[in-house]
Design a protein with these regions (language model features):
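C-terminal accessory segments of proteins
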Residues: 1-518
Length: 518
């Protein structure tokens, strides 16, 4: 049987049968002991486990029986982030969860075709966390297991994803695989081994994935930045999957992968055997409804209609009506030339490492706090001229122009204590102007989901933090259209979206700019 995952906002009512049965099944899974592979907490710990945080939130009691050392080593702390495995691992994880919940639904007398719904926060009518997740009781007055106390949003009971918070820009990127040398980080992320640690965010993981985590989870009390127990479950990877909304959020991320795959024939998944059959250093494993361990690879995650997945989505239509990064750029640069830019639209398959060059960087580590923070990036004149000169084939009316250089802003080795922090990032806002008055200068949204773990010096990456890449090619293109050029400096501004205090110690070790020559 093939199951259909439906849009939660189109199920007919706030308390549709799908959500009623989901709530009941969550309650059943929560009754199972932690050591049970099909329990709510075991499944959540596969994404991440932190004894201190779980205890503080009431999900673990000191002395409680844990799974065997073997089960913990194989099943727990598996989630893949800052990696090309981000999408296939989470797909297998969701499929396992969905099958276990469906089994519980059937045991409770529910429908055999129950499927996990998705939360499409890009729908203007569905930007808030669904009402069923915000009520303490179900319609019959019984406890609502979809509700959690540790979900804080903006701190005042507001759980809205505003239009400016997230974008679908990731869908415009043809390259699945990104690099880690300053250029495009890719739709799906950089080539890594098993990566439960930190590194460079892929495009879809950065936006909307990370941002939704931070804005939904939020922070209860900003006065105690060292107390991670004051952060919402969704804000921290080690607690995120304890919140029932996590699964609807990730169903939407998984759906967007399908949208990306279908919207353009140039959008290709990797064909590298190390992705298809990897990772070699640790196998992915999930439990089935009987608790048996099932290993999987990315190869098995490519056809959702086939076993072991067996599902479709209610809507995988293209929300951007065919718009791609190259087409958008072509439309703008046609103002420089009337030439038919045929070669400009050629694609080079699934992506990967492309030659990059450092254009420049700021002078020192900067600290981010509330309000507006800023820094200046000094560019090497000769390197900036290479970017400017890359537009010559367009200006000279070539019939086969080469695409000009792409330019990327890198926020390197971000460290801090506030996993829920979100910033809007702008480049070259006119002096004295409010950045919010210049949406054309906004280059993206920075979310620090996972930053506290990545900042620990005893972590797998030695406290290197996380790195975020934003494409700022449009800024450079606009300079050319204004008959100007990339000069010796760029001004970068960070505008806090939510509560950020100096005590959160958020720093960016280096802000750099790279060019990618195609």
């Amino acid at each position: 049987m093939t199951f259909e995952r439906k849009d939660v906002s189109k199920l007919g009512s706030d308390w549709s049968d799908t959500l009623v049965w989901y709530a009941k099944a969550v309650g059943k899974l929560q009754e199972r002991p932690l050591a049970s592979r099909t329990s709510w907490r075991f499944l959540a710990a596969m994404h991440g486990f932190n004894e201190v945080l779980w205890s503080a939130h009431g999900y673990y009691s000191s002395g409680e029986a844990l799974p065997s050392d073997s089960d913990r080593a194989r099943f727990w702390d598996q989630c893949q982030h800052q990696s090309w495995y981000f999408l296939p691992w989470h797909r297998g994880y969701l499929a396992s969860f969905e099958a276990i919940v469906r089994s519980a639904v059937v045991e409770l007398g529910g429908p055999a075709d129950w499927a996990l719904p998705y939360w499409n926060y890009f729908d203007p009518d569905s930007r808030s966390v669904p009402p069923a997740f915000l009520q303490k009781t179900m319609p019959d007055g019984s406890p609502n297991h979809l509700f959690v106390e540790a979900r804080y949003g903006d701190g005042h009971g507001i759980f809205i994803i505003e239009p400016e918070d997230v974008s679908l820009n990731a869908l415009k990127d043809h390259a699945f695989i990104g690099g880690d040398s300053g250029g495009n980080s890719g739709f799906g992320g950089p080539d890594t081994k098993f990566n439960h640690g930190r590194g460079v965010n892929g495009h879809l993981e950065s936006d909307p994935h990370n941002t939704v985590h931070g804005l939904v989870g939020g922070l209860e009390d900003e006065r105690h930045p060292d107390d991670r127990t004051t952060y919402g479950l969704m804000s921290i990877p080690a607690t995120a999957a304890l919140d029932p909304i996590f699964w609807l959020h990730h169903a939407n991320i998984d759906r967007l992968w399908e949208v990306w795959r279908k919207r353009d024939p140039q959008n290709l998944d990797p064909t590298d055997p190390s992705w298809l059959m990897g990772p070699a250093d640790r196998k992915f494993i999930v439990p089935d409804p009987d608790g048996e361990g099932i290993t999987f690879t990315a190869t098995q995650m490519l056809d959702t209609k086939a076993a072991p997945l067996n599902y479709t989505y209610q809507d995988t239509s293209d929300p951007l009506a065919g718009s791609t990064r190259k087409k958008v750029r072509l439309t703008g640069l046609r103002l420089l030339s009337d030439a038919p830019m045929v070669n400009f639209l050629e694609n080079k398959s699934a992506g990967g490492q492309v030659a990059t060059e450092l254009l420049g960087a700021n002078a020192s580590t900067i600290k981010l706090a509330g309000g507006v923070s800023h820094t200046r990036v000094t560019l090497d004149a000769a390197s900036a001229d290479k970017v400017n000169n890359s537009f010559e084939s367009v200006r000279l009316l070539s019939t086969t122009p080469k695409e000009p250089d792409r330019v990327f802003l890198n926020l390197e080795n971000i460290r801090g204590k506030n996993d829920a922090a979100v910033f809007y990032v702008y480049v070259n806002v006119p002096n004295g102007d409010d950045p919010k008055d210049h949406p054309e200068n906004k280059v993206g949204v920075l979310s620090l989901f996972g930053v506290s773990d990545a900042s620990k010096t005893d972590s797998a990456h030695g406290g290197a933090g996380i790195t975020q890449v934003f494409e700022i090619t449009s800024i450079v293109d606009n300079l050319q259209l204004d008959e100007s050029q990339l000069s010796d400096t760029l001004q970068v501004q960070f505008v806090a979206r939510n509560t950020v205090k100096p005590e959160h110690d958020i720093t960016v070790e280096r802000v750099s700019v790279f060019r990618e020559s195609l």
